């Protein structure tokens, strides 16, 4: 679609250095939620121009791209001016004129494969079940409330097909039981992973992205979780 194409064109300007293209895609009052950058279109253009002059070229490799209403959500591997590969989720909101007006993101350093040999970005990419977009959104909203926010942890098994859970988190192996074991191990060290507020739940077909706020080991944390849903159960997970 046009929105998807525009979002992918925008992130590609980090590699191409095409500041004119970036300018044409962005609303003048572009709202930036990445805390490392200034807000507004000019700040974005400044970043593109800065990267264009860097001695090492920036690379942008999009892995997954989805659309939900006026928002596009992407999973992408960036390497900004040779600083090292980062895995990112980007969310872009479009205004009524079709310009990109707002952006949220979360990035993590690219890590070695996890205990099950999976990376932060490999696994299923096929988009399907477009007729189940809202059903799957509700499933993830309920899961975030019941399980991640801890209101009804006893319901956890209802969200999974037995122990089947393909896991791309850098520190956890496949299986629902492995997630439980990892959280127990953290708790023994006095480390809690707490989800307090869910800000956005974006959905297209069998993929749903939850954007949440909480704490990890007492530090304020943004949690971006991408889940793949299969037959009404959570089947696969990527996160930053």
Describe these PLM feature segments.
Residues 1-240:
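C-terminal and inter-domain tail/linker signature
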